[in-house]
Amino acid sequence: MGEEVQMSDYDVSGDGDRVSEWEMGLPSDEDLASLSYSLIPPNLAMAFSITPERSRTIQDVNRASETTLSSLRGGSSGPNTSSSNNNVEEEDRVGSSSPGSDSKKQKTSNGDGDDGGGVDPDSAMAAEEGDSGTEDLSGKTLKRPRLVWTPQLHKRFVDVVAHLGIKNAVPKTIMQLMNVEGLTRENVASHLQKYRLYLKRMQGLTNEGPSASDKLFSSTPVPPQSFQDIGGGGGSSGNVGVPIPGAYGTQQMMQMPVYAHHMGMQGYHHQNHNHDPYHQNHRHHHGAGGNGAFESNPYMMQQNKFGSMASYPSVGGGSANEN
């Protein structure tokens, strides 16, 4: 090869195959420090417990020089082979000293590195670490502080639900109107569902037993319109709902509309005896215990001095014109 170093091109002296041109520009023996000279003084080495290295002799230097020259001469004939051998030896030394090196060697040998199908162990480990780091980060971001429903917070919730109506209240709107920092839509949705079940249990519409949230719910009185909304079947049948429980004055609210019927409607019954649809079906509904005619008669709504029929539910049959 043209790049190979030919030893015959240089002037070689007879003293140990020394090349004089290689020594040009190098310091002389007088300029160099003695091999027996220690860079660390003995007192300093003793103070810091430094073990002095063995001093080198001229024989050691000659031996190292001969080893270097022989490696250069051997490398000129096959530089690629020697470099590959050195790399393999270095890899073997590193692999034998590190744990798990057998699996890495197996992956490297299976890849062959020619067609790019091999997998670099370092890159694979870095990718695994990156994935685990991403999972840990996502797990931290998903953790949220648990919200505790206090009586004050529940009272605010009840006020908002009463304002919207239990049927029309949705978690998103409730959350916006409550305007509480840290309150999420999931918190409101879960609390709203428990609150509706609580209202149904209070009205006897479900057979479910008491829950752990009943103590919190009982801390704030339930607005009457919430009972009306949750109990009303709605619609054209005229069934407004079931009566409000005794804790909120059932007997008084049921007597007030009946008293308004006998007192406020007495003159109207005599004047419109033949044309009053309510009078024609009065016996039927009175015998059935129904008060649905109060809703179908707008004149009666005006004569009701107590104003209770528009805000509280009634019990019993359907519309006055049902038959």
Curated annotation (Swiss-Prot):
GO terms for biological process: circadian rhythm; negative regulation of transcription by RNA polymerase II; positive regulation of circadian rhythm; regulation of circadian rhythm. One of its GO terms (cellular component) is transcription regulator complex. Induction: Circadian oscillation with peaks at subjective dusk. One of its GO terms (molecular function) is DNA-binding transcription factor activity. Pfam families: Myb_DNA-binding. It is found in: Nucleus. InterPro entries: Homeodomain-like_sf, LUX/BOA-like, Myb_dom, Myb_dom_plants, SANT/Myb. NCBIfam families: myb_SHAQKYF. This is Transcription factor LUX.
